[in-house]
């Protein structure tokens, strides 16, 4: 087991500290310039579609979801425990300046996720009365023959293991730990309850999943945003200092408290880009499964909507988490991850902070379980056919129960590894799709 742990750590170090940072950020930069910075040009249209066009909430066809349902299903997966723990880890390891580099990665990532959604729409198929799409479809579209089949199969195996099984174990563990800490409820009992409710949603397929996410995701986001804003109002003088530390720390971390912790510009950049990309999932190949299901007139319309998911995830929710941590003065107390975030909310809400974090963890992690289950399901159908879906659902439910009680350090590291491995075929395909995306964008 020690050998396995070391191998996983070495692979993750190579992938997440070096290779994927360059590839993911590079793909975002290439698409940004190629599409003439579509994340800026179409940002207003995206916001208008998200908040002003009520037809997004309706317009459900027989074969797909509304654009809003597809977006909330994607956000359900994007906004997870990483939005609480991820920002805290980045700040603790890379200093306040890491948040600036999170913004940079998200900015370029918006162009990448636009391309993913456009290609998912362009190459989707009608199967069993529902639209289905994702990286496996556009991988085989752009690469014919054995190479395309190999890349698609490799991606499917990686995402099933990374998200469907191991990733969902980690999410249920976060819920169990949070509720045990706040309410002293046994972790196993929490895991069983989560698994039962999740199983009921799984049985209903994509329609029930979408119906669930379109109701829960706005509530969950609003609850967390209000909680963060309340704390920021209570610590208003610290907000200005927080923004100053973010910008100074991005280029001169030694000039602030982070310098005493040995934080460098390279370290701030590495942790900011890594945690940002991992949280918003731009370029990772997960969210295209959701965006492929939307019934829209033009694939590029859903691409614009997809960009809003990255904006909400990183520029709103992750940023608010970071500001709460920095403005409450808990940075430097020796904690990291969710513990650091929890300390910040305890400063703002007292003992209610534990309860607030537990509720947020429940919403964030549970919706991620639902979203990740569906992404895995699409790939199970691709590899093994419809008959394997029930077996897959049972395994996921078991993983949710087991994950609630385990120490999941190795499981999380393995999920990171397979998550990284699934990015590689997706990025190869996206770079191969550059001319297609550019052509579709010009026509729209």
Ranges and model annotations:
Residues 114-123, 128, 229-245, 253, ...:
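Extracellular/periplasmic helix-exit of transmembrane alpha-helices
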Residues 108-116, 192-206, 217-237, 270, ...:
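Selective recognition of specific alpha-helical transmembrane segments in multi-pass small-molecule
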Residues 23-30, 34-47, 155, 172-179, ...:
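Membrane-interface loop-to-helix entry segments
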Residues 1-77, 81, 92-97, 109, ...:
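N-terminal alpha-helical transmembrane segments of multi-pass membrane transport
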């Amino acid at each position: 087991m020690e050998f396995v742990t070391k191998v996983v750590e070495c692979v993750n170090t190579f992938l997440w500290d070096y290779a994927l940072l360059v590839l993911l950020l590079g793909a975002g930069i290439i698409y940004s310039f190629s599409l003439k910075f579509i994340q800026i040009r179409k940002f207003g249209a995206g916001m208008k579609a998200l908040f002003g066009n009520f037809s997004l909430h309706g317009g459900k066809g027989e074969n797909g979801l509304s654009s809003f349902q597809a977006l909330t299903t994607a956000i359900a997966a994007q906004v997870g425990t990483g939005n609480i723990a991820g920002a805290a880890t980045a700040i603790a390891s890379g200093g306040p300046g890491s948040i600036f580099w999170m913004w940079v990665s998200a900015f370029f990532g918006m162009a990448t996720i636009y391309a993913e959604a456009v290609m998912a729409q362009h190459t989707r198929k009608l199967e069993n009365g529902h639209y289905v799409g994702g990286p496996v479809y556009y991988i085989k579209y752009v690469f014919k023959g054995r190479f395309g089949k190999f890349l698609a199969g490799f991606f499917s195996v990686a995402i099933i293991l990374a998200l469907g099984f191991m990733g969902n174990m980690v999410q249920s563990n976060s819920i169990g730990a949070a509720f045990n800490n706040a309410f002293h409820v046994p972790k196993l009992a929490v895991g069983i309850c989560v698994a039962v409710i999740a199983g009921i949603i799984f049985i209903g397929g994509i329609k029930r999943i979408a119906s669930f996410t379109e109701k829960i995701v706005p509530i969950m986001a609003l609850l967390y945003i209000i909680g963060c804003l309340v704390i920021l109002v209570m610590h208003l003088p610290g907000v200005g200092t927080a923004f100053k530390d973010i910008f100074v720390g991005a280029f001169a971390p030694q000039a602030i408290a982070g310098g005493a912790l040995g934080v460098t510009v390279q370290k701030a950049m590495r942790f900011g880009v890594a945690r940002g990309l991992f949280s918003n999932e731009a370029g990772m190949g997960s969210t295209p499964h959701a965006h492929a299901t939307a019934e829209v007139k033009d694939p590029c319309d859903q691409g614009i909507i997809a960009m809003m998911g990255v904006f909400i995830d990183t520029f709103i929710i992750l940023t608010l988490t970071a500001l709460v941590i920095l403005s409450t003065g808990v940075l430097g107390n020796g904690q990291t991850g969710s513990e650091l975030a929890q300390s910040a909310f305890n400063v703002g809400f007292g003992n209610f902070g534990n309860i607030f974090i537990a509720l947020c963890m429940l919403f964030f992690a549970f919706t991620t379980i639902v979203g990740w289950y569906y992404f895995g399901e699409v790939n199970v159908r691709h590899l093994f056919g419809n008959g394997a879906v029930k077996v897959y659902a049972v395994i996921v439910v078991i993983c949710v129960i087991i994950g609630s009680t385990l120490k999941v350090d190795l499981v999380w590291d393995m999920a990171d590894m397979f998550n990284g491995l699934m990015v590689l075929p997706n990025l190869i395909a996206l770079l191969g799709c550059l001319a297609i995306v550019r052509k579709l964008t010009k026509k729209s």
